[in-house]
Regions:
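N-terminal glycine-rich phosphate-binding loop and ensuing alpha1 helix
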Residues: 1-31
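Acidic donor-binding segment of Leloir-type glycosyltransferases
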Residues: 26-50
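Residues at the starts of beta-strands that form the adenosine-phosphate
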Residues: 29-31, 79, 153
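Short phosphate-binding loop-to-helix
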Residues: 45-79, 140
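The conserved acidic donor/metal-binding loop of glycosyltransferases
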Residues: 84-88
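Conserved donor-nucleotide/metal-binding helix-loop-beta segment in metal-dependent transferases, i.e.
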Residues: 90-116
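Short, glycine-/small-residue-rich phosphate/pyrophosphate-handling segment
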Residues: 125-147
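Conserved alpha/beta core of the MobA/IspD/sugar-nucleotide pyrophosphorylase nucleotidyltransferase superfamily
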Residues: 138, 144-193
C-alpha cells in the first residue's frame, strides 16, 4: 500500500498529530518521546516534548522503561501514561478522562484496549512502577491480568478515540471513513488511495 518513503512520512505525521493533541491535554505536565530516529527529536522539540534517544530500536517495553526511569528520577512523576503514536482519532478530552479515573486512587491502572482487544492503546500507571509493560503479544490481557494478580485496581476506559489505531492496511481503510477528523495522517492516507 505505501512505499518506504510514504511510511516514514506517515509515521512522522502520526507523531505530529499525537503531539499536537498531547500538548493541549490539561492534566499532562510533560510529554516524552523515546526513539532511535532523529526525525522524532525534531518533531518532539517542535511541540515542546522531551526527547529521549535510544541507541537502537529495542521495542516498546524498552522505550517505556527508559521513559519511566526519566519520569521517576528527573520528574518525580506520580503517574505516567503510555500512548502510541498511531491513534488518529485521539483527543485531549479522553486523556483528561483517564487522569480523572486515576485521580482519587493511590495505586491503579487505567487502560484502553485496541479495537481487537489484543493490544493496549493507552496505559496510565499510578505510580509509574506499579506494573511493568507487556507490549508484545496480547498486551491488553497481560496488563489487566498482571494488575489483578497484584491486587491493583483496574479501570477500563473504552473510547473510540483511543481504540482505533493503524496497525494494518485494513485499519487505515476503516479510519479514513471517519468524518470531522483533522488528523494530518488520515489526510495523507486518503491522498495515497
Amino acid at each position: 500500500m505505501l512505499d518506504t518513503e510514504d511510511r516514514i512520512r506517515l509515521s512522522s505525521l502520526m507523531l505530529e498529530d499525537t503531539l499536537q493533541i498531547l500538548s493541549v491535554a490539561p492534566p499532562l505536565t510533560q510529554v516524552i518521546i523515546v526513539s532511535a530516529d532523529k526525525r522524532a527529536d525534531e518533531i518532539a522539540t517542535k511541540h515542546g516534548a522531551k526527547f529521549l534517544p535510544e541507541e537502537k530500536e529495542s521495542g516498546v517495553n524498552s522505550a517505556v522503561a527508559l521513559a519511566d526511569g526519566y519520569c521517576i528520577e528527573k520528574e518525580a512523576a506520580d503517574a505516567t501514561i503510555v500512548i502510541p503514536h498511531d491513534l488518529p482519532l485521539l483527543d485531549s478530552i479522553v486523556i483528561s478522562k483517564a487522569c480523572e479515573l486515576a485521580e482519587k486512587e493511590s495505586t491503579c491502572i487505567v487502560i484502553c484496549p485496541s479495537v481487537r482487544y489484543d493490544g493496549t492503546n493507552m496505559l496510565l500507571r499510578k505510580p509509574p512502577s506499579v506494573i511493568g509493560t507487556f507490549y508484545e503479544t496480547d498486551s491488553y490481557n497481560m496488563h489487566v491480568r498482571t494488575a489483578i494478580k497484584l491486587g491493583i485496581p483496574v479501570k477500563p476506559l473504552l473510547s473510540k478515540s483511543l481504540m482505533y489505531d493503524i496497525d494494518t492496511p485494513e485499519d487505515a481503510l476503516q479510519l479514513i471513513k471517519e468524518e470531522n477528523v483533522a488528523a494530518k495522517s488520515l489526510e495523507f492516507i486518503k491522498s495515497k488511495l
